[in-house]
Amino acid sequence: MSTFLGFPRRRPADDEEPFGPLPHPREPLRWGDPFPVAAKTALANTQLRRNLARATTTIRDKRARVVDEVPDWEALRDAGSAVKAQVLADLPALLARLEESVTARGGVVHWARDAAEANAIVAGIVTAKGVDEVVKVKSMATQEIGLNEALAEHGVAAVETDLAELIVQLADDMPSHFLVPAIHRNRREIRDIFLARMADAPPDLTDAPRELATAARAHLRRKFLTTKVAISGANFAAADTGTIGVVESEGNGRMCLTLPETLVTVMGIEKLVPRFEDLEVFLQLLPRSATGERMNPYTSLWTGVTPGDGPQEFHLVLLDNGRTKVLADEAGRAALHCIRCSACLNVCPVYEQVGGHAYGSVYPGPIGAILTPQLTGPSGTAGGGHRDPNAALPFASTLCGACYDVCPVRIDIPSILVELRAREVDADRGRLDPTAAAMKVASWAMSDAARFTAAERVASWTHRLGGADHMVRRLPFPGSLWTRARDLPVPAPQSFRRWWAATHDPEEPS
C-alpha cells in the first residue's frame, strides 16, 4: 500500500545524473553508514528536509481528521493491542493452525528460517514454472530478504507493480518510507527515470502526474496480462480460516492476486490474527493510521485455491528471519505487534529531518530503530573494524513519545528504545567513550569546591565567543562535537555563586 504525494526533492545540478541512485545493498537490514554519519549527510540537504516536513505534515493532518471521526478510537487501539499480544503468546499453536487451514484449502505452506531459505524456496517455485519474469505486490518482507536480487541471480526479473515501488526499482534506489517509498523523488526525476529505464515510455513524456501515471499503467498492464507468476506479501492472515489479506490503494495488488496462474506469498510469522473476525479491528485501524483514509480502496482476501477462479496454485512462505529471537525478548517483543502503518514515521521529528535512507534498513523511523537491531542482533564489529551500524539506531530518537501516542496497536516504542540503549551502553563498558569521558571530567570538577570554582571562571570567559545573540556556533574539538550540529548558549559572565555572594549578606539566614 502506498500513497504517491509527488513532493519535490532538490533539483540535481547540471552535471549530476538526473536521478542519482542509491544501489541496493547486500544486507537490506544493515547497510550504509552508521546513523550519525548518514544523518549528518541528510541534514545537509535542506531541500529534502523541507520536502519531508511537507509530506509528513500532509499525512499527519489527514490521519488526525479521520481518527477524530471515530468515537471509540482508543478502544479500537486497545483491541488491536490485545489481539497482537494474544498472537505472540500463542504463536506456535496459531502457526500450526494456519498451516492446517491453508493446506486444507489447497495451498502449500513453506517454512523459512532466514532470508536465504526464503529466497531459495521462492526461487525454486518460480524457476520450476520456467518463467523469466514475475509481478510483485508491494511487500516489505520481500524487501527485507532481498528477494528481487535473489531472483535476478536465477535469471528472473521481479517487476514491482506499486507505482512508488516501481519508481524506486527503475532508479535502482531504496525505499525511504513504508507507504510512500519514493517520497524523496520529484516529478522531474520520475519522468527522467521512466524515459531512461522504462522501455515503453512515450518519448514525449512530461512530468504531469496524469501522464506519469498513464505511462506506468500502460507498462504494468502488459505485465499483468502476460506474467504467469505473482509474488505478494501479506498484511494479515487468519489462522482459523487460512485467509490471507492484502490492503492497497492502487488496484495493482488486485491484478497480481487474481490474474496469474501461480501466487507466492511471503509473510512474516507475526502477521497472524487468531480469527477471521479480528480483521474487523485492523481494517479500521490500518487505513486511518496509514494513509488517512476511512477504508482501504482495495482490500483483497483469499483462502487457498478456488477451482476456476484466480490463481490455481498458491504457496505461503512463513518467514522467521530473526522474529523468534525477538519473540524471546520480553522487553522488546512488542515490536512484533507492528502492522506497518508508518504513523510513527510521520510524527517523528528525527525522521522528518533525515528521511528513511539514514536508518540503513528497509525499516526506517521509530519502529525501525527498535525492530531492525533486534532482527539482526549484535554483530560485534563489521568489516574493517567498524562497529555494527545498527547499534546506533536506538539513539536515533528524541524520546518525545509522539510515536507511542499515534501507534494504532500501542507499541511503547520509547521504552523499548531506552532498553536497547541500556544494552548498548552495557556492551560498551570498558571502551573509551567520549560521553563517559566527559562525565568523568565533570564529576572530577564538581566533586571539589576549588576545582568547581576554577571551572566556573574558565566557563565565564567563553561568553566572549558568542555573537550578538549570545550563541557560540563553532568550538574546537571536543566542543566541535556539539557545535557541528547545534548552537551553544554562552554562559553568563557572572556565575550564580558569585552573584549570590555579591548580593546577599553571609550572616543573613537563607
Where are these regions (language model features)?
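The feature marks the mature, well-folded catalytic cores of soluble enzymes
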Residues: S2-A331
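Intrinsic disorder at enzyme termini
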Residues: R11-I59, E69, E352, L393, ...
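A glycine-rich phosphate-binding loop feature that marks nucleotide/adenosyl-phosphate handling sites
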Residues: E117, N296-G308, R340, Y351-G355, ...
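Short, contiguous, pocket-lining structural segments
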Residues: K271, L336-R340
